[in-house]
């Protein structure tokens, strides 16, 4: 049986890293990439090649392929997966259930976090010029009905899941440009105690988007962050979340989702370049196994942080170099 040991690090600008291997472990191999683009493309390929096609996975594939299209556009490469995107959109449209939303498979009963992933994918596709057949008014009516139906039970829910659902519904209605009484809904949701850090962060994001006067200062959100041994920032509940049968199937309530929410808040607040870089580094630290955990998280991480890393300068990226034991390398990928 062979066993490997290693370290993963993100080197920004002129950063230096001291790595002292254990001679008893044998030969050391160093692999370096010049930018994060290959990591994104690898993640996109993993999502694209994933063999199963539940509604979440199809929506995640759409998101991933749209991200691939943006990368290819940047580098002047021909995108050849339009038919694949169109086919996925057609299947998602056919799987919309009688409640105008989506469940795990086919036209099963609604799962709100899956519906959110699907709706976001459809809206992103429309922005890129694809036809989705999405009936926005019917969808708006369904989401608004779901919001009103869930409100009474949310105030007394101690798990945070009901509040999380309300936040998702209001967020989707905003993305659909629905004409609803946002101040009333925001005030009600904000009045519900936060049972989780995710509740607190998502409430802050809702207020930032819809009621800025009630938005907490960015510094107060940074005070809630945790740090990895490498100094990367992430957001985790200090106490373990109460286990429930539903929570196992709620990937939208996790450290990753908390950290993505914090990232979006700080990006929108502006003047937080250093903090955003440390958050991105956290996500790359989580790829120690070579990929993120699942199609849902991978697609959401890529769509959130990738645009900020597509720093374009005359159509090319700034030159990168790496010095190892005094020897400079300028061609990547590098393996030695």
How should each PLM-predicted stretch be described?
Residues 12-22, 157-160, 166-336:
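Long, domain-scale non-catalytic interaction/scaffolding regions in large secretory-pathway
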Residues 1-158, 167, 250-251:
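Extended, solvent-exposed functional surface patches
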